[in-house]
C-alpha cells in the first residue's frame, strides 16, 4: 500500500504501531514489523530501504505529537478547507453552488462528526479526500450507485466511524470481508446492494448494534453469522433469503429488540424466533409461506409493535391476546382472519390496521380500546356492524376506504379529536351531516362518494387543510367551500355536474389546487385572487380556452394544463419567475409565441411537451440550459 501515512499509525495497516515497530533508513518512516516484510522500498515515500532498526517508544510518541501539531497548524482552527475538499471529491468540477459543497458546509458546522452525501453520486468522483476527516463518526453514501469499488474501499480507512449508510451502492463481498477494520461501528445499512452474496465478514463487527440488509436479494451465505452478533439490537432483513435455520442462531438471551423479516418467503416456521423474548418490534409482513409456529407470538410479552400483514394462516386473534403491551398492530390482508376474540384485551393499542380483512364483520371489540388513535378498516367487505366506533374518544385517524356498507356519517360525529378521515369509496353515503362536529379535522378524502350533492354540512371545519374530492358525479353545489379559509390543498377531480367554481376563488390560503376533468370549467378569472398558489393542476379541462391571469401567480412553482386541447392562451407566462415544473402535454392549440416565453423562465427544471407543437429552437435552448424535457 502506497501513498499518504496516517498520523500516529502505520501507513500500511492503518493501526497504531504494534510492539516492536521498525524505523526504516534512510527515510526514517516507522511501520509495524509485519507490514514491511520482504519490502525493498518504503511503503510511504517509495525510497529504497537501506536498512532498518527497532523504533524507540519515545520516537513513536514524538512522531505522533509533532505530526498532529503540524496538522493543526497547516489547516487552522477549522481543520478542513471546505472548497478544497469539495473540489477533491468532485474531481475538480465542483462549484460553491453544488450539492457537495452545501453538504460539506453542514458537516463543518457540526465539527465534521456527521457527513451526509446521499444522492450525490452524479457529482462524487474521488473519495480519497475523506481520509482527512479523521473525526467522522456518521457517514451516508446511500444512492451513490456510480461510485466504483476502489472508491468505496476508502470508507474503510475511516476508523472512527460509528454509523455508516451505503444503501444501493456497489459494495460487494470483498468490501464486506474488509469491514472488520471499522472496530467501533454500531450502525450499518447496505440495503439494496445487489453485489453482496456473502456477509460472513460482518461477523467481525462485534460492536454492531443495528444492521439493515433490506432487499439484498443475492445474499446466500452468512445470515447465521450475523444473527449471532452479541450486541445486535436491531436487525432488518426485509426481502432477503434468510431461512428458519438462520434465525435459530439468534441468541435467546441476546439484546435484539427489533426484527424485520418482511417478505422473506423462505420463512415457514416461527418457532425459530420463539425464544427471543427481548423483542419489542417484529415485522412479518408478506411472509406468505409461514404455516407453523403462530402460537409462539403469545410469548413475546415485551412486544410493542407487530406487523403480520398478509399471513394466510392467521384465522384467530387468540394467539395475540397475551400481547398486552402492544401499541401498534397490523393484520392487514389476512384474508382468513375472522375470529377477533382476544383483541379487546389489547387495551394499550394506539394503532390498529385491519384493512383487507374480508372476514371481519363487527367492530364491537374496539369499545375497550380507549387508547386507540388510528384505525384502518379499509376494504373490510363483510363489515356490517360499526358499534364501538362512537366510543373511541381518542381516535385521531380513521380510514374507511371502500367500506361500502358504511352509510351513516353520524356514527362518528362524537369523535372530537379526529384529524384525518378517509371516506373514499363509501358510495352509499348521501350526506355529510355529522361531520360539522369534527372541529379539529385537518384532512378529508371523499373519492368516489357518488351520492354526495353538497358541501354545506362541512362549512364550519375551519381547521381543514387538505380536501380530496374525486368522481363525486352528483356533486353540484360547492358553496360550502368558501368558508374553509384554512384550506391549503384542494383536489377536485371528475365532478362533472359542477358549474359554479366561484367558492374556490375565496380560498386565499390554498397552496395546491387541482381541478381535473371538470367538464364545465371555463372561467378562470378568479385565479388571480389565489396569490399564494404554488402548484396548479388543470388536467383534461377541455372547455378552457384562455388563462389570462396566470402571470399574477408569482409564487407558482408547478403548472400543469395537460390535455386541455382547446387552450390557446397563457397570459403572462413569462412573469412566473419561480416556476420550476411546467406540463403542457396535449395542449395542441397553443401558438409558438407561448412556447417562446419558456426561454425567459429562469428556474425552469422540468418541461413536459408531449403532443404539443413546441418549436425546435425552444427545445434546443431548454436542453442547453439543462432543463429535463419529456
Curated annotation (Swiss-Prot):
- List the GO biological process terms: cAMP biosynthetic process
Keyword annotations from UniProtKB, A to Z: cAMP biosynthesis, DNA-binding, Leucine-rich repeat, Metal-binding, Repeat, Zinc, Zinc-finger
InterPro entries attached to this UniProt entry:
Leu-rich_rpt_Cys-con_subtyp (IPR006553), LRR_dom_sf (IPR032675), Znf_RING (IPR001841), Znf_RING/FYVE/PHD (IPR013083), Znf_RING_CS (IPR017907), Zyg-11_UBL_adapter (IPR051341)
Domain of life, per UniProt, equals Eukaryota
The UniProt entry annotates LRR repeats at 115-123, 124-148, 149-170, 171-195, 196-218, 219-242, 243-266, 267-289, 290-313, 314-336, 337-359, 360-382, 383-405, 406-428, 429-451, 452-474, 475-497, 498-520, 521-543, 544-566, 567-589, 590-613, 614-630
Which GO molecular function annotation, any one, does this entry have? DNA binding
Which Pfam family name is an example for this entry? Answer: LRR_EndoS
Task: Describe, by residue range, where the zinc fingers (RING-type) fall in the chain.
Answer: 10-46
Please give the function described in this protein's UniProt entry.
May interact with adenylate cyclase to regulate its activity.
**Under what name is this protein listed?**
Putative adenylate cyclase regulatory protein
Species the sequence originates in: Trypanosoma brucei brucei
Encoding gene (name) = ESAG8
Amino acid at each position: 500500500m502506497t501513498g499518504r501515512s496516517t498520523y500516529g499509525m502505520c501507513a500500511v495497516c492503518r493501526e497504531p504501531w504494534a510492539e516492536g515497530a521498525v524505523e526504516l533508513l534512510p527515510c526514517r518512516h516507522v511501520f509495524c514489523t509485519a507490514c514491511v516484510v520482504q519490502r525493498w522500498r518504503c511503503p510511504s515515500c517509495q525510497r529504497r530501504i537501506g536498512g532498518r532498526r527497532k523504533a524507540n517508544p519515545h520516537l513513536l510518541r514524538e512522531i505522533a505529537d509533532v505530526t498532529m501539531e503540524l496538522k493543526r497548524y497547516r489547516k487552522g482552527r477549522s481543520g478542513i478547507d471546505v472548497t478544497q475538499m469539495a473540489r477533491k471529491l468532485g474531481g475538480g468540477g465542483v462549484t460553491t453552488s453544488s450539492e457537495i459543497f452545501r453538504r460539506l458546509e453542514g458537516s463543518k458546522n457540526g465539527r465534521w462528526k456527521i457527513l451526509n452525501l446521499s444522492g450525490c453520486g452524479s457529482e462524487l468522483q474521488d473519495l480519497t479526500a475523506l481520509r482527512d476527516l479523521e473525526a467522522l463518526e456518521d457517514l451516508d453514501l446511500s444512492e451513490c450507485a456510480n461510485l466504483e469499488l476502489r472508491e468505496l474501499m476508502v470508507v474503510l480507512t475511516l476508523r472512527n466511524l460509528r454509523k455508516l449508510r451505503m444503501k444501493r451502492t456497489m459494495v460487494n463481498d470483498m468490501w464486506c470481508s474488509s469491514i472488520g477494520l471499522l472496530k467501533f461501528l454500531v450502525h450499518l445499512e447496505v440495503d439494496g446492494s445487489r453485489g453482496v452474496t456473502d456477509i460472513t465478514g460482518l461477523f467481525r463487527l462485534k460492536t454492531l448494534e443495528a444492521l439493515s440488509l433490506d432487499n439484498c436479494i443475492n445474499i446466500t451465505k452468512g445470515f447465521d453469522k450475523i444473527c449471532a452478533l452479541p450486541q445486535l439490537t436491531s436487525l432488518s432483513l426485509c426481502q432477503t433469503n434468510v431461512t428458519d435455520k438462520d434465525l435459530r442462531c439468534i441468541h435467546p438471551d441476546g439484546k435484539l429488540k427489533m426484527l424485520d423479516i418482511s417478505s422473506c418467503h423462505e420463512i415457514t416456521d416461527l418457532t425459530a424466533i420463539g425464544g427471543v423474548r427481548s423483542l419489542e418490534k417484529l415485522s412479518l409482513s408478506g411472509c406468505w409461506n409461514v404455516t407453523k409456529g403462530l402460537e409462539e407470538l403469545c410469548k413475546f410479552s415485551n412486544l410493542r409493535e407487530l406487523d403480520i400483514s398478509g399471513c394466510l394462516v392467521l384465522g384467530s386473534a387468540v394467539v395475540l391476546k397475551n400481547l398486552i403491551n402492544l401499541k401498534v398492530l397490523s393484520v392487514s390482508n389476512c384474508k382468513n382472519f375472522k375470529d377477533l376474540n382476544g383483541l379487546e384485551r389489547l387495551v394499550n393499542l394506539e394503532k390498529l390496521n385491519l384493512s383487507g380483512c374480508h372476514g371481519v364483520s363487527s367492530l364491537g371489540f374496539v369499545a375497550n380500546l380507549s387508547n386507540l388513535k388510528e384505525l384502518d378498516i379499509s376494504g373490510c367487505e363483510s363489515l356490517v356492524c360499526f358499534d364501538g366506533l362512537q366510543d373511541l374518544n381518542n381516535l385521531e385517524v380513521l380510514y374507511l376506504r371502500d367500506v361500502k356498507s358504511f352509510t351513516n356519517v353520524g356514527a362518528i360525529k362524537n369523535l372530537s379529536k379526529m384529524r384525518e378521515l378517509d371516506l373514499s369509496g363509501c358510495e352509499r353515503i348521501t350526506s355529510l351531516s355529522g361531520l360539522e362536529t369534527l372541529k379539529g379535522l385537518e384532512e378529508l378524502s371523499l373519492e368516489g362518494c357518488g351520492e354526495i350533492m353538497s358541501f354545506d354540512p362541512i362549512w364550519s371545519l375551519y381547521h381543514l387543510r387538505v380536501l380530496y374530492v374525486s368522481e363525486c358525479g352528483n356533486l353540484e353545489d360547492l358553496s360550502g367551500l368558501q368558508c374553509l379559509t384554512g384550506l391549503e390543498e384542494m383536489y377536485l377531480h371528475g365532478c362533472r355536474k359542477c358549474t359554479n367554481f366561484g367558492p374556490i376563488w375565496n380560498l386565499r390560503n390554498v397552496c395546491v389546487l387541482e381541478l381535473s376533468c371538470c367538464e364545465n370549467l371555463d372561467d378562470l378569472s378568479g385565479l388571480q385572487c389565489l396569490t399564494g398558489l404554488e402548484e396548479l393542476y388543470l388536467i383534461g379541462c377541455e372547455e378552457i380556452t384562455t388563462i389570462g391571469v396566470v402571470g399574477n401567480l408569482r409564487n407558482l412553482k408547478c403548472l400543469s394544463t395537460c390535455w386541455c386541447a382547446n387552450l390557446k392562451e397563457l397570459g403572462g407566462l413569462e412573469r412566473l419567475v419561480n416556476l420550476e415544473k411546467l406540463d403542457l402535454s396535449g395542449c395542441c392549440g397553443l401558438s409558438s409565441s407561448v412556447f417562446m416565453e419558456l426561454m425567459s423562465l429562469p428556474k425552469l427544471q422540468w418541461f413536459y411537451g408531449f403532443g404539443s407543437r413546441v418549436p425546435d429552437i425552444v427545445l434546443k435552448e431548454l436542453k442547453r440550459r439543462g432543463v429535463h424535457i419529456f
